[in-house]
Amino acid sequence: MIDNNHLRKRKNINLVIGLGKSGVWAAKYLRSIDKRVIIWESKDGKEFLEIKTELEELNILVSLNKEFVFKEIHPFIKEIESVVVSPSIPYDHETIIKLKKKGIKVIGEINVAWEILKETNWIGITGTNGKTTVTHLLSHILCENKLYAPFAGNIGTPLCKYAYSKKYEKIDWVVAELSSYQIEISPEVKPNIGIWTTFTEDHLERHKTLENYFNIKKSLLEKSDFRIYNYDDKNLRNHYSSLSKGVWITTSLDKSNFIQCDYWIDDQAFIIERGKRLFKLEHFSLKGIHNLQNLLLVIAAARKVGLSGKKIKDSLSNYKQLPHRMETIYKNNDLEIINDSKATNFDSSIAGINSIEGQIIIISGGRLKGNKYSEWVQVLKQKVKCIFLFGESSKVLKMALINEGFKKDIFEFSELKELLNFVFHYLQNNKVGTLLFSPSCSSFDQFKNYEERGDHFKKLISEKLKVN
């Protein structure tokens, strides 16, 4: 039941846009510190009714089917203290621009949490690819060493949930994956340690230019007290002299790189820290050079936190990677089936393909992000036996493959189920070492997110294996 007196006192209103997880916990936290909170949700479905009731019992007014437009806010704009927006809303949205011109604070859920968590140690991880693995692995290593270091931000639990439950008082380190969308709406967040994993063309439908995208990522590192970069990434390496001073890692054995870098792996699998052996890498389950880069970034951060080489090494032996990232879902003597649904762009797909030896058939498709695909096609020409395409981008990708000189078989389908029926027929007549699900595109043409897409793929594979 909503307290009408609470709603009549409309001064210092905090308007939260969106009933997603982060919006809900931002609203709950703000209300718990006696802020007046209103939530607007643009959709109007049955799935929102239960949470609407729960929030209204906390004296949070929830309006469904309410568009985020300035004319709806203008009548009570003088009473607005802040507007908390979802990362999915572009920062150049017309309403956001007008609100900022009026001096209204426009932030995201992470910035809301920062206001109470800023006295806690923070590690902020960003990058086009690799940031989720780095976030999860670093959190694992710190937690294995009796530090409470939850992973949060773009993955895991919304930080406002910790603020709401008072659990933040026990946190030793916040390990936050921060997308470019989240960095834009978290201007006050200043991590103790900032990590930049990779930088390649992505999200240009949102950021318009590569320079804008780069500068958003860069801003997080500039605000960090201590910075860690990936020298193997050519775009970061090319900005070596212009980026804020920090620690660099490399997996290259080219000794000329060691002058610029602080961490690398030698030819005997020893982790090297500033020219000295830290420990020998013996138990690390993740495939590919890109995951060795991720590991070195994590080691550099863990060392800055204060962990010994032995403690880091011991923590690696029981690490289990997150699903949908080069996830082996079936393996026998003849065939391995890998789910890499997290490969939502061409660079991520290339990294996965290059980590596999032997004959590959690949499944790709989804919604294109406007990326350049020439390098991806060149890798396919060298590494795969044939390609199966599905979804919204299938026709565009087929033409791109043909135009780039891909001479092997291309099969095109609208949906995964039909595609996999043909794939299993193909496998009966062709010997292939690996079936790789590497969409190279976003999932939004047919799925809510890459997790749903990956789960759907795994379900279909499970059904096919039972039949076959």
From Swiss-Prot:
A GO MF label: ATP binding
Localization per record: Cytoplasm
Keyword Cytoplasm carried by entry: yes
Main location: cytoplasm
UniProt keyword list: ATP-binding, Cell cycle, Cell division, Cell shape, Cell wall biogenesis/degradation, Cytoplasm, Ligase, Nucleotide-binding, Peptidoglycan synthesis
Domain of life: Bacteria
Binding residue positions for ATP: G127, T128, N129, G130, K131, T132, T133
This protein's pathway: Cell wall biogenesis; peptidoglycan biosynthesis
BP GO terms, sorted: cell division; cell wall organization; peptidoglycan biosynthetic process; regulation of cell shape
GO cellular component, one term: cytoplasm
Cited Pfam families: Mur_ligase_C, Mur_ligase_M, MurD-like_N
Annotated EC: 6.3.2.9
Classification via HAMAP family: MurD (MF_00639)
Family assignment from sequence similarity: Belongs to the MurCDEF family.
Biological role: Cell wall formation. Catalyzes the addition of glutamate to the nucleotide precursor UDP-N-acetylmuramoyl-L-alanine (UMA).
The protein, known as: UDP-N-acetylmuramoylalanine--D-glutamate ligase
Organism per entry: Prochlorococcus marinus (strain MIT 9312)
Taxon lineage: Bacteria, Bacillati, Cyanobacteriota, Cyanophyceae, Synechococcales
Gene name as annotated: murD
